[in-house]
Curated annotation (Swiss-Prot):
CDD domains: LbH_MAT_GAT
Name of protein: Putative acetyltransferase DDB_G0280825
Leader sequence residues: none
GO molecular function, one term: acetyltransferase activity
Protein's organism: Dictyostelium discoideum
Amino acid sequence: MDSINMTEKEKMTKGLMYDSFDEELCKDRTEARELIHRFNNSMDKLERKDITKQLFGSTGEKIYIEPTLRVDYGYNIHVGENFFANFGTIFLDTCPITIGKNAMLAPNVQFYSATHPIDPTERNSGLELGRPITIGDNVWIGGGVIILPGVELGDNVVVGAGAVVTKSFGSNVVIAGNPAKIIKQIPVKSE
């Protein structure tokens, strides 16, 4: 499909330049904020789980997220079975953010699929863009980690606390630092 014939929402989720002040996108963000407000103010974990299932694009059955949670839209977030996120998780989900099964997120983990043009003229036009983030299975992400647009992490990755992940990494590694780099390989035990 030609981008001229796409809605701003379609452009956004495909990582193309889009107008974030589009009426449909503004409405979507408002609806997400209303659900997030209910989620963050609920003491009932079953109610929070139900809200998450309404908000996210897809989830496994076994998920647990501690308040507070922040999202842009919610519908571009996809998490697998056995997902745990501690408090302070942020998803800037202009593009899809996909996380596999058996993921553990420590406090204050941030996923930024949103970005802005580097060229100042384009940036000042108000148009934005994004790049998807994809995280594999069996991943543990430490406290305060920031994952930037376009990053892909393989299976069995451990991300050290405070890391800023600016590029993609394969499976079975421990990464840490700013910018994140491989600290060591993880030997995989056969089952």
